[in-house]
Amino acid sequence: MAGLLFDVFAKSRDRGVLLHEFVIMPEHFHVLATVPEQLTVERFAQLIKGGFSFRAKRELGFTGEVWSQGYYDRRVRTDEELQSIRHYIRQNPVARDLAQRAEEYPWSSANSRFRMDDLAPEAKASFISSL
């Protein structure tokens, strides 16, 4: 399931989204992304949750609701806020005792197998969490 959700994250790059950090936890996810002007943060969240729901039902046989309604988002305004969010995302599995080190968790941008996009200084990144 986590692989399917990451595929949906990665597919958002086709729409110009830049992925900077992410973690896929057993019951929620966090993502730090820059969403292009033609795509709102709300629409990006819909694409992620809706895209995953559609594929999970089709490919994994899920029935019913996959996600809770809504999501949490926050525009990143300062470098300090950016560093705090990056740390929070990377350390989430460690805080939940799912890994001893962030790099060991298989579904996190802290793991070196994932290629993340650079964050330009002038970019307007958003932090999104969902259950």
What are these regions (language model features)?
Residues 1-131:
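Short catalytic/metal-binding and nucleic-acid-binding patches
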